[in-house]
Amino acid sequence: FDMGGTSTDVAHFDGEYERAFETMVAGVRMRAPMMRIHTVAAGGGSVLHFDGARYRVGPESAGAEPGPACYRRGGPLTVTDANVMVGKIQPEYFPRLFGPGGDEPLNGDVVREQFAALAARIEAETGDKRTPAEVAEGFLRIAVENMANAIKQVSIQRGYDVTEYTLNCFGGAGGQHACLVADALGITRVFVHPFAGVLSAYGMGLADLRVMREHAV
């Protein structure tokens, strides 16, 4: 379970890696062995929307620039901001790397202001009165459901009992949601790697270099 800023990638492991030898990337057929990975547009930078009737998470992403609203660069509300709103991300524990000059802390105040404005808008348009934190929790539930459904596609829908597995979690945003995703699936064990935030890069550095060439005869 690899949750980054733009998307979440999931794969199944049961004693061996599952590989695909032919896949489509941007409409182009690729014939090369690669991990069988299922991807959904749910990441820490996924933009939160209210369309007048329902909440939506993504598929648009704020990316690293401007990034989430809490980055102090004028970005929109995102999944990361929802975690700030509910207290999972506490700005005082993060380095001062944000803002236009890269020397300011995460901005919790702007997150609370924007969620308060969004809660007021939702009440005005629907009559549904919720606190800003409840609005943020609603968006997080949708994001968790999207990620849980992705895991179901590589497990339950293929006949595997996901409750017997350990959820191996990494990626910059994975630890914020791993337990909620596990609860949604009935998984009782979660493993968060010590290098979770940089594990993909770490793995690339340790990977063997392999070249495959094909020639039609």
Predicted regions and their residues:
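N-terminally biased helix-coil "hinge/interface" segments that flank
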Residues: 1-217
